[in-house]
Amino acid sequence: MKPESSVIFFPCKDIEETKAYYTEVLGLPIYKDLGATVWFDCGYGYLAFVNYGPDRALATGQCISFNLPSTEDVDRMYEKIQALPVIGLKGAPQKHPRFPVYSFFFSDPNGYTLEYQKPLD
């Protein structure tokens, strides 16, 4: 049976700060808000954050990537992000030296690496 969608859960430091960042800065709509858990609609699946409390470690080594339709869209998103209160903007969009994508990276308030990318043919 084929799943109808997918959701990936990440622990977060502060659910309200995370919710504000992903809605106000990145513009992702909330799909479900369950108090200590919030799901964001990414258009092709869901990204969720959970406040497990202070004893739960955050995930490490992950990159949350959002695919855009074109390299021009990546450039436009970079211009938007550059003007906003983002954390750890890691440079302008470029072709990745190892993978066939055009992208840029930055961090969310939890320290997770975020990427906007366009896969290249």
Sequence positions of predicted segments:
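Conserved short beta-strand elements that form part of the metal-binding/catalytic scaffold
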Residues: 29-62, 113-118
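Short beta-strand micro-motifs in enzyme catalytic cores
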Residues: 38, 62-64, 100-104
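N-terminal beta-strand motif that seeds the catalytic metal site of vicinal oxygen chelate
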Residues: 1-16, 64-66, 120-121
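Vicinal oxygen chelate
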Residues: 79, 84-121
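Amphipathic alpha-helical segments
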Residues: 16-29
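Short amphipathic alpha-helices in soluble, non-transmembrane regions
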Residues: 23-25, 77-82
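Short secondary-structure junctions
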Residues: 27-34, 87-92
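Short, conserved charged micro-motifs
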Residues: 17-18, 71-77
